Amino acid sequence: MKACVFPGQGAQFVGMGKDLYDNNPLAKEMFEMANEILGFRITDLMFAGTDEDLRQTKVTQPAIFLHSVILAKTLGDQFQPDMTAGHSLGEFSALVAAGALSFEDGLVLVSKRAMAMQKACEATPSTMAAVLALPDATVEEICASIKDEVVVCANYNCPGQLVISGSIPGIDQACEKLLAAGAKRALKLKVGGAFHSPLMEPARTELAAAIEATTINKPSCPVYQNVSTKAETCPETIKANLIAQLTAPVRWTQSVQNMIADGATHFIELGPGAVLQGLVKKINKEMTTEGMQ
């Protein structure tokens, strides 16, 4: 069975989507529609901006969403996955690709999500760190041991690769303890703030109202959501999981394992980069993977 997966923040690069825009009339039309909806020419930043432009959360998230979703739309009838999933932001791309969300509604929600997250990051300086080669339980235990600071596991990317999220002093303390416990690496990431942690609560509250007011349809195939890790098709459950996602961890390892248990054998990553293909292979080396961008 075929699974289509969609990347999240961090996969962006200058020039992403330009080939699509230049060579496919439908893609060009959709990119121009996006420029109108957003009220600025995001295509200028995607195709010819600077890395710094693209690193701004309010630009990064809609840019990656557009690249992924427009790519899926241009495939037409060739795009017929048996199941989909997206990593963090990529979950919105997966829902649009599966017909649960309209392109316009998806873009508006992603833009609101990005703005709300950027605002929360500016209100409380915070960060994230990648942790390599420690069991999940050890990382969880160390995060829980840090008192008076927010430190949580935010991304379960593949066995032996987690991302933690929290306040800057909390992450600094956690990195020291993790290295002492034998982590191969505990490295702070260049991100705007503590995504998928309780520090995103103001953004979650803001986005919840927008998600509640948006129509979500039954998807054409199951969407494996980050929060539940299971195949979801019920619009109300999808909404609840989308709202919870901002302050909850991305359980990617478990999601991919569940997709495989349900019959997935071939994973196609749609959008910039090849991060998810690498993670799928680390979760189960028997899987075949390919990327489209």
Where are these regions (language model features)?
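FabD-like malonyl-/acyl-CoA
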Residues: 1-139, 189, 266-293
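Short acidic/polar active-site loop segments enriched in Thr and Asp
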Residues: 82, 149, 184, 265-266
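A short, flexible low-complexity segment enriched in Lys/Arg and Gly/Pro that occurs
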Residues: 62-68, 245-252
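A short, acidic, amphipathic alpha-helical segment used as a generic capping/interface helix at domain edges
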Residues: 249-264
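Non-catalytic positions within long, well-ordered alpha-helices that form the structural scaffold/packing
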Residues: 76, 179, 260-261
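Alpha/beta catalytic cores of group-transfer enzymes, especially the acyltransferase/condensing modules
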Residues: 9-11, 38, 98-247
